[in-house]
Amino acid sequence: MAESELMHIHSLAEHYLQYVLQVPAFESAPSQACRVLQRVAFSVQKEVEKNLKSYLDDFHVESIDTARIIFNQVMEKEFEDGIINWGRIVTIFAFGGVLLKKLPQEQIALDVCAYKQVSSFVAEFIMNNTGEWIRQNGGWEDGFIKKFEPKSGWLTFLQMTGQIWEMLFLLK
């Protein structure tokens, strides 16, 4: 089971980093969890890149090994308080995207698998540090998607109507 979970997380990371680099995926269409992750994590990543632009402009990542070291140091600090939630898990993917974009463009061009190497250490960190929490909180399909998938207007309308009826019933 752990191996299949790691493969699933690795696939999510790989698809996300392909999305960041705008590398066309030649496989089947991404899963719903993958699409939601791309939308949410990329939004977080853009916000981080905008807010920390002056810092990131002077921030250099010379190699995949350097990216791995920086990633592990930052994530260790981020999770030292032991608090895990879906928002923090999304930031792991987003930070992987930031680091990948900071690699020298020549290296990414020469090493077309750079995103695969980054996705490996992102997936390993997620599995080793948040895997149990993910399982306990519904997994990617029942936990993550429900947390971040926007509700349709019709569904929201029905929920609001139900709440209004509940309030009217309580007022009687």
Curated annotation (Swiss-Prot):
Q: What is its main location?
A: cytoplasm
Task: Find motif (BH2) and give its ranges.
Answer: 132-147
Q: Which family does it belong to?
A: Belongs to the Bcl-2 family.
Q: From the UniProt record, list the coiled-coil ranges.
A: none
Q: What induces it?
A: By granulocyte-macrophage colony-stimulating factor and LPS in macrophages.
What Gene3D superfamilies does the annotation carry? Blc2-like
The record's InterPro entries line, in alphabetical order, gives: Bcl-2-like_sf, Bcl-2_BH1-3, Bcl-2_fam, Bcl2-like, Bcl2_BH1_motif_CS, Bcl2_BH2_motif_CS, Bcl2A1
UniProt protein name? Bcl-2-related protein A1
Q: What does this protein do?
A: Retards apoptosis induced by IL-3 deprivation. May function in the response of hemopoietic cells to external signals and in maintaining endothelial survival during infection. Can inhibit apoptosis induced by serum starvation in the mammary epithelial cell line HC11.
Please report, in chain numbering, the residue ranges of the motif BH1.
Answer: 77-97
Native species: Mus musculus
Residue ranges spanning the membrane: these are none
Keywords (A to Z) from UniProt: Apoptosis, Cytoplasm
Provide a GO CC annotation, any one: cytoplasm
Question: How the protein assembles, per its UniProt entry?
Answer: Interacts directly with BCL2L11/BIM and PMAIP1. Interacts directly with BAK1, BID, BMF and BBC3. Interacts with BOP. Interacts with isoform 3, isoform 4 and isoform 5 of ING4. Interacts with UBQLN4.
Protein origin, superkingdom: Eukaryota
**CDD domains named among the record's database cross-references:** Bcl-2_like
Q: Which cell locations does it reside in?
A: Cytoplasm
Disulfide bridges in this chain = none
Q: Known Pfam families for this protein?
A: Bcl-2
What GO terms in the biological process aspect are recorded for it? B cell apoptotic process; B cell homeostasis; negative regulation of apoptotic process; negative regulation of B cell apoptotic process
Keyword Cell membrane attributed: no
Q: Report, as the record phrases it, the tissue specificity of this protein.
A: Expressed in hemopoietic tissues, including bone marrow, spleen and thymus.
The UniProt entry, under SMART domains, shows: BCL
